[in-house]
């Protein structure tokens, strides 16, 4: 596939690493708005903005239902309407982090990313497919499945610049979602995420670079800032990795906005030099090809 079909032009992106996740939903939303406005002042040509996982509510299994919202474009909930207005105001594609979603038909709760186009239209959503259920000795014990249900599909978004895939945090540990989006022509994988301070130092950079190199796409991980006063301590270090595995932008632990330019020439030149897309042998590993 040629680069022109993957990414139509250079685009600037911004990842907003903010300390949301407070008990005050509107304060969290307003803080996101403040940071997005700042990003657009600092880099007016920004076309794509990403927010962190669970930015508008506490990241706690006993709080997800309380903060959950029904995602219905015809009757926008508080967060959906707020983020829609921001995308429209600044004419950006907005990957709105994640929010707890209530499905009124099943009463199930999902960890869901909502994606808006430049007109503020909700163009898709991604429900976290792989739930964060871990017990790390001398580390962390956390079970999203106590409250949340897993999503049932992969998500690839089509925009005027090209396609990108969306996963959420723990989803990045499973290479299949990125592979599916890449095979559909995605130029990037975007993961609103909240790794903790145990697994973050071990795997954050490794996984970001692995997903990028595996699929020769850009990878963006957007984390909350670390807040030691909250019950969950995020790793931070929001990051942008290019298709060669090179880190092109990285945040620290605190509140910060990082910027990067995605370049179709980087994708094209690396795919020509190392033509993985032409060399894969799905005739050999045919079970991977089933989708």
Curated annotation (Swiss-Prot):
One of its GO terms (molecular function) is omega-amidase activity. The keyword Cell wall biogenesis/degradation does not apply. Keywords: Hydrolase, Phosphoprotein. CDD domains: nit. GO terms for biological process: amide catabolic process; asparagine metabolic process; glutamine metabolic process; oxaloacetate metabolic process. Residues 11-264 form the CN hydrolase domain. Its EC number is 3.5.1.3. Coiled coil: none annotated. It holds the Pfam family CN_hydrolase. One of its GO terms (cellular component) is cytoplasm. It is an enzyme of class 3 (hydrolase). Gene3D superfamilies: Carbon-nitrogen hydrolase (3.60.110.10). The keyword Amino-acid biosynthesis does not apply. SUPFAM superfamilies: Carbon-nitrogen hydrolase. The modification Phosphothreonine is found at residue 34. The active site is at 53 (proton acceptor), 128 (proton donor), 169 (nucleophile). It catalyses: a monoamide of a dicarboxylate + H2O = a dicarboxylate + NH4(+). Present with 4510 molecules/cell in log phase SD medium. Possesses omega-amidase activity. The role of omega-amidase is to remove potentially toxic intermediates by converting 2-oxoglutaramate and 2-oxosuccinamate to biologically useful 2-oxoglutarate and oxaloacetate, respectively. Homodimer. Belongs to the carbon-nitrogen hydrolase superfamily. NIT1/NIT2 family. This is Omega-amidase NIT3. It comes from Saccharomyces cerevisiae (strain ATCC 204508 / S288c). The gene is NIT3.
């Amino acid at each position: 596939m040629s680069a022109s079909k993957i990414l139509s032009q250079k685009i600037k992106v911004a990842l907003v690493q903010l300390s949301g996740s407070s008990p005050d939903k509107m304060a969290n939303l307003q803080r996101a708005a403040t940071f997005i406005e700042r990003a657009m002042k600092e880099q007016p040509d920004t076309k794509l903005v990403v927010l962190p996982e669970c930015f508008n509510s506490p990241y706690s299994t006993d709080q997800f239902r309380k903060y959950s919202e029904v995602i219905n474009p015809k009757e926008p909930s508080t967060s959906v309407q707020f983020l829609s207005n921001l995308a429209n105001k600044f004419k950006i594609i907005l990957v709105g982090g994640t929010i707890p979603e209530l499905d009124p038909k099943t009463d199930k709760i999902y960890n869901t990313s909502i994606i808006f186009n430049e007109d503020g239209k909700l163009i898709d959503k991604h429900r976290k497919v792989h739930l964060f259920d871990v017990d790390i000795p001398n580390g962390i014990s956390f079970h999203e499945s106590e409250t949340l249900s897993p999503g049932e599909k992969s998500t690839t978004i089509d925009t005027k610049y090209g396609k990108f895939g969306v996963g959420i945090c723990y989803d990045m540990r499973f290479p299949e979602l990125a592979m599916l989006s890449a095979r559909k022509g995605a130029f990037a994988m975007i993961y609103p995420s909240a790794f903790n301070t145990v697994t973050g130092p071990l795997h954050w950079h490794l996984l970001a670079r692995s997903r990028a190199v595996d699929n020769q796409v850009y990878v963006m991980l957007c984390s909350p800032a670390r807040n030691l006063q909250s019950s969950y301590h995020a790793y931070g270090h929001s990051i942008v990795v290019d298709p060669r595995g090179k880190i092109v932008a990285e945040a620290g632990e605190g509140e910060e906005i990082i910027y990067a330019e995605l370049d179709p020439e980087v994708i094209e030149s690396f795919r020509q030099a190392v033509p993985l897309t032409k060399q894969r042998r799905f005739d050999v590993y045919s079970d991977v090809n089933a989708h």
